[in-house]
Amino acid sequence: MDLGYEQKACNKLKNDSRDDEFLVSRIIFLTTYDSSIDMEKLIDQYHLAENICLNISRHAKQFVTKQKKVKELDPMEDMALIESLKLMFNLTHFCPERAGAFSPALPHILVILTKRAISSSKPLDPPIGPLVNALINIPLDSKDNLAAFFPKAAPNINVDRLDEILEKGIKAYADNELDQLVSPVLTLLRKVYENAPREVQQHMQTVLLPSEADREKVLGRAESLASRLLRFSTNPSTPQVRETISTLLFDLSDKDARKFVQNVGYGFAAGFLFQHNMPIPENALEAWSTSDSEGSNARASQDSRNNPLSGRVNPITGQLLEKEELIEEEEMTQEEKEREAERLFVLFERFVIPIKWSCYGCSWQYKGWRGRAWWAWRIQSRRHSSRAGSWN
């Protein structure tokens, strides 16, 4: 590139040769990390995006051509495809202003993604992972791209494929691999949901949010995709996946804190809402209530009519009340209640006393040793006023 051969390199990609595609794509891919490369010039003047889309379309032909027998793929075919996809991702990432130039590749990528078999042991190994990555930066808001991603004959076909990849991915990979491999799938699903027609959005909500069957147990304990996502939303060893899953579930809840609590339970929702400085329902029951404050009565009543689970769900755990296990315990005697009250009082005192010392420390320095002695006497007298044996 520094020698001025960028035009020749881009023209070389026109050749219907997997060897040329592999080598030239790899070379240009490596140069994208050099900030001195004029990517807009490569795309606008030397037709780099057009040539990449052409090569990807060539790879897609083998999946749409009717063949009596499926030929075994040439290893060079996949290697060249992977390099083209990696180059495409880097160009759309480092030069987002020209991401739209790669839109012609969208239908071909989707064909390959839906026709290729997905491994259960390594579902995001190349070329599946690079196919997903290549889709992330392509704008979906144009009419042609929406028609390609959500075809009228089967609007959910590509979403279902991504859901399948996601489910196999979170089952197959260890925690230390999830952030790198699975996060792009979640990011793409968020983008797809944002641009999808309403019927596709409803389908995604049905698949990715907990169902009534999931609520037969405490949310997150079933083996469905939705329950697995909930478990990973609190996994401390996968910070990127954890954050992306929570954000996706919040998006699926129409970015409404109340619906979010209804969908995933107060336990899973509270931490995410707090971290993002979003208003949290003051009471877990508020998310399911039908008689909130005067200003939200109409909304709560509407939610109650629209939600068949209203009044049937534990708002903290998300489990159906009728499926909760009842723990039968003998009622405490009066003496047991008093002993328990004393124990709690002692624990409370142990917690409060250090706070008293720290709070009054700033004033003691002005009152001198007499002030410190007086406060020490007050605290000690409170301790000894409790019953004998209460410190055990």
Regions found by a protein language model. Name each.
Residues 1, 22-38, 79-96, 129-144, ...:
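Alpha-helical solenoid repeat architecture
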Residues 1-23, 30-53, 64, 70, ...:
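Elongated alpha-helical scaffolds that mediate protein-protein interactions in large eukaryotic proteins
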Residues 2-15, 45-67, 100-121, 152-173, ...:
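Amphipathic alpha-helical segments within extended alpha-helical solenoids and repeat-rich scaffolds
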Residues 3-7, 15-26, 40-43, 47-51, ...:
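Residues within HEAT/ARM-like alpha-solenoid scaffolds
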Residues 10, 25, 29, 53, ...:
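Amphipathic alpha-helical interaction motifs in eukaryotic regulatory proteins
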Residues 83, 87-104, 180, 232-244, ...:
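Extended amphipathic secondary-structure runs
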Residues 140-319:
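Eukaryotic scaffolding regions of large macromolecular assemblies
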Residues 256, 261-392:
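Intrinsically disordered, low-complexity regulatory regions
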